[in-house]
Regions:
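Short, strongly hydrophobic alpha-helical membrane anchors
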Residues: 1-5, 193-199
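Short, aromatic-rich membrane-interface segments at the entry and exit
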Residues: 32-36, 127-131, 156-157, 181
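Interfacial helix-loop-helix junctions of multi-pass membrane proteins
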Residues: 53-70, 114-142, 180-195
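Internal/C-terminal transmembrane anchor helices
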Residues: 157-175
Length: 199
C-alpha cells in the first residue's frame, strides 16, 4: 500500500507532470514569465535536495542527533508539483478570492505531498526529519508562487483538456522509477574526492 502511494512522488512521475504544468501556466493568467518563475523555484528546490544527497552519498555528511541524512526528494517534488497539478486541474476558470492561495485544490495538493512523505517513512526510505524537510521545501515552492503571483487560472474552455492531459501523463508515468538516486550514488564519491571534502 505505502509503496503505491510513494510512487506518486517519484521523479519519473512528478517531473513530466511539472512539464505539463509549465506548459499550461504559459496559457493561464500567470503567463510565460510566471511559468518560468515556478520552473526556477522548482529547480532550486531540486538543487537543494540534490546537494544534500551528494553530500551524504559521497562525503557522509549527516546530522546524527535528528537522524537527518538527505532531504526527501519524493516528498519535496510531490509537495511542490501536486499542488500546482490540483490548482490547474480543479480551479480552471474559477476566480480566486483576492488572489489568495488558500484554496481547496491547493490544500489537497499539499495534503497529498504530506501523505507521500508518510509513505516514505513507512517504506523505510526516509526518517521523519528528512520527510518534514522535504515537505517544507516543496510547500515553500508551491506557496511562495501562489503568494507572489496569485492562483493561476486557465480559460474555462480548456479546463477539461488541462485535467485530461494531467491525468494522461499521470497514468502513463505512474509506477515508473527515475534512476536519479543510482546516478547520485555513483558520481557523488568522485565529486567529493575531487574537491577533497571530508565529513
Amino acid at each position: 500500500m505505502w509503496t503505491a502511494v510513494s510512487d506518486l512522488g517519484d521523479a519519473a512521475m512528478t517531473l513530466p507532470l511539472a512539464v505539463v504544468c509549465i506548459a499550461w501556466l504559459t496559457r493561464s493568467t500567470a503567463g510565460r514569465r510566471h511559468a518560468a518563475s515556478w520552473a526556477l523555484m522548482l529547480a532550486a528546490g531540486m538543487a537543494l535536495v540534490g546537494a544534500t544527497k551528494m553530500l551524504y552519498a559521497g562525503c557522509g555528511v549527516q546530522i546524527r542527533p535528528i537522524h537527518f541524512r538527505v532531504i526527501s526528494g519524493h516528498t519535496m517534488l510531490a509537495s511542490a508539483v501536486w499542488p500546482m497539478v490540483c490548482v490547474l486541474a480543479l480551479s480552471g476558470g474559477v476566480q480566486p478570492r483576492a488572489s489568495s492561495p488558500r484554496s481547496l485544490p491547493l490544500g489537497v495538493g499539499l495534503a497529498l505531498g504530506a501523505l507521500i512523505g508518510v509513505a516514505r517513512v513507512f517504506d523505510d526510505a526516509h526518517t521523519p526529519s528528512e520527510v518534514v524537510a522535504g515537505w517544507l521545501v516543496g510547500s515553500a515552492v508551491a506557496l511562495a508562487f501562489m503568494w507572489r503571483h496569485g492562483t493561476p487560472r486557465v480559460d474555462a474552455r480548456y479546463r477539461a483538456l488541462v485535467a485530461g492531459s494531467l491525468l494522461a501523463v499521470s497514468a502513463a508515468a505512474y509506477g515508473r522509477h527515475a534512476p536519479i538516486q543510482a546516478a547520485i550514488e555513483l558520481y557523488s564519491p568522485f565529486l567529493c574526492g575531487r574537491f577533497a571534502f571530508q565529513p
